[in-house]
Amino acid sequence: MNLISKKNELKQGFYPLFFLEEFYIRVLIHMNHNHILKIGNIKQSKLIHVNRICHYLLIKRLIRQIRKQSHKYNGISEFPNYETEFYFQYKNRFYNLMIENVFLLILQMIWQHQKTRKNDPCILIHRSIQSTFPFLENKIIHCIWIIHGNIQLFHTIQQLNFLFLLLYERIRDKSFLHLLKNIFNLKKELLIEAFYCDKFHLIELSMFFRNLYINEFDSFIVYHIVKTWKLAYLLNPSQAIDDSSFIQKNHILLNIKRKQKSLPLVSWLANRSFYSLYGNIHYVRRDLSFLMAIQAGKHISRFWKYNSINFLQLKLGFPCSLDVLYLKSLFNQDFLFLGYRIVNKLWKKNFKIRAVSWYSPILFFFKGRRISTKMPVLNLIHRLSVMHLCNLEGYPIHKAAWSVFNDKQIMNIFSNLLRNIILYYSGCSNRSDLGKIQYILEFSCMKTLAFKHKSSIRSTWTQYKKHVSLLSLVKNRHKNGKTSVDLYFLFQKTNKLWLLDLSKIQDSLACFIFID
């Protein structure tokens, strides 16, 4: 592993969010409380050695080490964006022990059946921690709860969401995932539905596993596709891949001149897997729905089956079944899935579909099927008619519900909708049909503005044609404040790899990876 990969691994492995007051205070209180209960007995607690390691002074020294690194603790959302190099060796025994105790204790406190003890010494500890580390008072919102003494256990929804936010922010670290596996191996009752007194906790845990799976699945695909086509130098090593901002084709094209020679460590799953990739991969994802079409050998098919199906078949407290009747109804016909047409190319009687689902059939492994590269224009026009932007024949109409917004907001809504559709279907072979969709959205925007100002379409067109027009949408790209998309830039094929960002289409996330 080169030096840059080690530095990136060190950055991703450091946990500033773990060392908020509530977490390590609870660990310290739990350990000291167990030790105090056995003071009168001859036998001493087995946690004495642990108390010596997780001592208050050691934690204080660790906080001082974090304080020296000149971070910007302006909010929780800015924690993953730090760029300062860390020199703290997180792979030592103290660090791993801290994380293990923190998670074991927090998970035990969240779903415990016993009530909180009245004589809880946490208030005094809270005050001492706040006086010892005053630099965290104005920099972390979580400290406001500590100052007012409102923190007890994680019973409120806000505190529970804070924990899962912390888990979700750090699901890309190898050491964290390894520790998380150990926690659920030791605490197997966490995966039993009867263990939870409130189903809300089970739903939150299931959502966390869902996000974990989505992140690992996308990172795995990107890592190995890029590795196969030897396009590692196109990526920026310092740029991480997350689930809300996929690798954009623009970044890849702009980084061609930079010629980066190293690839960041994207995923622990991808890092521990070795295989060769042949053929084409068609991958479409929209939130929880997945579509995977692979034209490859037996080796990669077995690999996908092992890493995808086995992970989804975890007993998370709710059934993970397969709607076989729905799949059988699609065997002899073409069907639409996530806006793309699945063509029945070579159907056989002994054809087997390997699929797993959370709630409905969402993950398909097709053999003998292919994704059509043609955009389903009629289906898209039908979806626009459902949104009341046109009729069933494709004639544009006004959107009365959007007339309450100002003119700039209306134009931004239509331009963003058009831009998302262009990004989502930019890999299609019939890209010229996007002009029909563009015509519908443009004149629907004009009619909405005319309906708002109670004027004619001709006068509205004369007034706003400088901001929204066919020529500006095709040729210009955000020039002079015009809403536009550079179609030529999107459609130029400099590589065989298409990596488009996640686009929001009718309040749904979608991602499409297409290899010619």
Curated annotation (Swiss-Prot):
Keywords: Chloroplast, mRNA processing, Plastid, RNA-binding, tRNA processing. Pfam families: Intron_maturas2, MatK_N. One of its GO terms (biological process) is RNA splicing. The keyword S-adenosyl-L-methionine does not apply. It is found in: Plastid, Chloroplast. InterPro entries: Domain_X, Maturase_MatK, Maturase_MatK_N. One of its GO terms (cellular component) is chloroplast. Belongs to the intron maturase 2 family. MatK subfamily. Usually encoded in the trnK tRNA gene intron. Probably assists in splicing its own and other chloroplast group II introns. This is Maturase K. It comes from Chara globularis (Fragile stonewort).
